[in-house]
């Protein structure tokens, strides 16, 4: 049961981009009847976009993020015709259009096959390491997420934990949750 709270972002300057968000996939999203281009481009609307039309800068940003995620060749395809992994890459490109610093990912690999999951984890790792994007990920896929994380925030009743992956693997919380698997 959620309690309450707030998130305060360190927003600096007029041109600061906000936080990008990749929601957990729903059936409604999977059936969305827009082109890949339209979905990705809609991400710039989070950036204090007051004009009802997209400008050259918006389009260049969308194209850059599509290239970064290797989906430029899908530009004209209908979003709902894509595989689950491709759809997640499209939504990740859209989220990147909204930020250059922080991404919040909600269960990003849910519903993906193992190969697509690992590919998405590698993409997320590259965004963090090469693009210096902070990643905050909510996941039940702890065993795989541990391989890509630097820190873990585990919230469970009165067994909360925050620390490095190594500290987590040695903790009682990890042993209870993973049955010692993380310590192998």
Task: Give residue spans per PLM region.
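Conserved ABC transporter NBD signature motif
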Residues: 2-19
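Conserved ABC ATPase "signature" region
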Residues: 56-74
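Conserved ABC ATPase signature
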Residues: 78-82, 86
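Catalytic Walker B motif of ABC-type/P-loop ATPase nucleotide-binding domains
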Residues: 103-106
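Helix N-cap at the start of a conserved alpha-helix in ABC-type nucleotide-binding domains
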Residues: 114-116
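H-loop/switch region of ABC-family ATPase nucleotide-binding domains
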Residues: 139-140
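H-loop (His-switch) and adjacent beta-strand-loop-beta switch element
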Residues: 152-165
């Amino acid at each position: 049961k959620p309690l309450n709270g707030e998130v305060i972002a360190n927003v600096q300057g007029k041109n600061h981009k906000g936080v990008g968000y990749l929601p957990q996939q729903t059936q409604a999203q999977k059936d969305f009847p827009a082109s890949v281009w339209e979905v990705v481009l809609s991400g710039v609307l989070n950036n204090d976009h007051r004009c009802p039309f997209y400008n050259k800068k918006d389009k260049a940003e969308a194209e850059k993020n599509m290239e970064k995620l290797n989906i430029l060749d899908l530009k004209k395809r209908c979003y709902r015709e894509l595989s689950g992994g491709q759809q997640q890459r499209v939504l990740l490109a859209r989220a990147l259009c909204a930020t250059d610093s922080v991404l919040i990912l909600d269960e990003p690999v849910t519903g993906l096959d193992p190969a697509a999951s690992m590919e998405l984890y590698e993409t997320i790792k590259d965004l963090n390491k090469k693009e210096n994007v902070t990643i905050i990920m909510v996941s039940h896929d702890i065993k795989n997420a541990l391989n890509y994380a630097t820190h873990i925030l585990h919230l469970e009743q009165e067994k909360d934990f925050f620390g490095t992956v190594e500290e987590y693997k040695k903790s009682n919380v990890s042993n209870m949750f993973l049955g010692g698997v993380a310590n192998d």
